[in-house]
Regions:
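Residue-identity detector for glutamine
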Residues: 11-13, 32-33, 37, 46-47, ...
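Interdomain/boundary linker segments immediately adjacent to catalytic/signaling cores
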Residues: 1-73
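Long, charge-dense tracts
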Residues: 36-44, 105, 110, 126-151, ...
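Catalytic centers of nucleases
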Residues: 49-134
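Generic hydrophobic, helix-prone segments enriched in Leu/Val/Ile
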Residues: 45-49, 55, 109-112, 125-129, ...
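Metal-dependent nuclease catalytic core centered on acidic motifs
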Residues: 135-212
Length: 212
């Protein structure tokens, strides 16, 4: 009976020690996870601080007071996208590095050229894309694409889709824009959904009076 008692005590002690060991491992793992989360948050916050610094000096932003939103939109997109990536421990995938301030691209996403177009109204933004590609005919062929305001992208795609499936629902101005989109696709041998993408913000969100 004594031997059984000793063995039982030893087993209980071993079990308790193992539980303590698991607890310590869990605590250490939690500490490491929290440290990583803190670092991720710090990295993401740095991106937002860079944006704050840029917006905080309007005199150095290209354009007049009414057009500075174009360059603001570029920085908002780059910093917001990078912050989202960094917050979950992924690498930033947007950069201005190696891009001239007046180059045909505004920034790079995953190494690909991106031109940002933020005009007042979806028609104005689409026309700006058409004009840009006339100036740089090989932009798309070299892997480039366009970022436009989220709300305008939704309108553009809605008009495009209704033009394909419910043509009669289009207004006169929407019909004209739809025809221009189809003609542009045929001319460039592309699909709009492949080369035009939404940003994280709407047109109104990048106006200087809003973000200042």
């Amino acid at each position: 009976m004594r031997l059984i008692h000793v063995l039982k005590n030893n087993q209980e002690q071993a079990t308790a020690a193992w539980i303590d060991h698991l607890k310590n491992l869990r605590i250490e793992d939690m500490i490491q996870q929290l440290a990583r989360q803190d670092k991720n948050f710090e990295n993401a916050l740095q991106q937002l601080n860079e944006l704050k610094i840029f917006i905080g000096d309007p005199e150095h932003i290209l354009g007049s007071y009414l057009t500075k939103h174009g360059e603001i939109a570029e920085h908002v997109q780059v910093r917001f996208c990078n912050a989202d990536k960094l917050l979950v421990g992924k690498a930033a995938n947007h950069t201005f590095e190696g891009v001239g301030r007046t180059a045909m691209e505004d920034y790079l996403r995953n190494g690909k050229m991106i031109q940002s177009k933020f005009y007042n109204g979806v028609k104005g933004t689409f026309n700006a894309i058409v004009t840009h590609l006339k100036s740089y005919p090989y932009f798309i062929k070299k892997g480039g694409s366009y970022d436009i305001p989220r709300d305008q992208y939704e309108s553009l795609i809605d008009i495009y889709n209704r033009g394909q499936t419910a043509r009669s629902s289009l207004s006169r101005s929407e019909e004209t824009l739809f025809k221009h989109m189809i003609a542009w696709e045929n001319e460039q041998d592309v699909k709009i959904c492949d080369v035009v993408h939404p940003t994280q913000v709407d047109y109104k969100d990048v106006q200087l009076k809003v973000v200042d």
